Amino acid sequence: MYELKKSKKSKARFFSTTSTYFSYRKHQLFKFYIPKNPSRNNTGKVSMRCKRKKFKNLDLAINYARIEMGRNCLITKLSFWKEKKPYVALVRDSYNSLSYYIAPAGFFVGRTLKTLPTKHDYYKKGGWKFYIRGLGTYVMLRVLRVNDVIFNLLSPSRVLYRLALAAGTYFKILYQSFCKTFYVMTIPSGLIIRVPSEGLAVMGRNSNTQNNKRVLGLAGVNFFNGTNPRVRGVAMNPVDHPNGGRTKTPKPERSPGVE
């Protein structure tokens, strides 16, 4: 008497058995999706480096907070993330789980990174400050001293400071306030900032310190590394380019978008 009519615009899928459903989910999970627009992904970010669909820059989910406590993580792989950014380390902890961390300078495959220490680790081996103040260890700012170098600074509200995130950059501790409520430190630009002492940071500096000395000499290779090649205005003709020609003229500077 009644008929079940399915709309053409409906995206509902019906499965006869449970095994069919899970096989479909497994197929969708490991399926390599290439969008129709080869220059952007589903979130609207530029991920494709070439329209030939040969190169793809993945947006890695990097664990900045390291909320796991008392774990020793083994570095299994070092990867190049983005241009002017530190290397990314794929680590495996004692619970056999994988995660991406920012690799400190001087760390290679096979070394261990320590997460936030537990209460037992603070009083281990007699000298608690000496034990947890190791390179690549995630520590609280209260255990830092003058002239210590840190990176990956987090505020007490678990918010990453948008400072010293480039390759080879770091924070330098100047002194602690008399009331011991904040630390005074410098950023790579030379600016002096104040950070609450309840924050967290990693001992050391960002990796990829020789990034500014790397010269490939080819615009096509730099394009796949995340750098957009720009043509100098001197190399353009002023006939068909508004910003072309020499600058030693009475005419003011103009941008390419201005008619």
UniProtKB/Swiss-Prot annotation:
Enumerate the GO terms in the molecular function aspect: structural constituent of ribosome
Show the ranges annotated as biased composition (Basic and acidic residues): 250-259
Query: What processes does the entry annotate via GO biological process terms?
Result: translation
Record flagged with keyword Ribonucleoprotein:
yes
Q: Cite the PANTHER family for this sequence.
A: LARGE RIBOSOMAL SUBUNIT PROTEIN UL2M, RIBOSOMAL PROTEIN L2
Q: What is its main location?
A: mitochondrion
- Segments spanning the bilayer are none
For this UniProt record, the keywords arranged alphabetically read as follows: Mitochondrion, Ribonucleoprotein, Ribosomal protein
Give the matching SUPFAM superfamilies. Answer: Nucleic acid-binding proteins, Translation proteins SH3-like domain
Subcellular location, in the record's words?
Mitochondrion
The GO cellular component terms are:
mitochondrion; ribonucleoprotein complex; ribosome
In this chain, the stretch annotated as Disordered covers: 234-259
Q: Which family does it belong to?
A: Belongs to the universal ribosomal protein uL2 family.
Name of the molecule in the record: Large ribosomal subunit protein uL2m
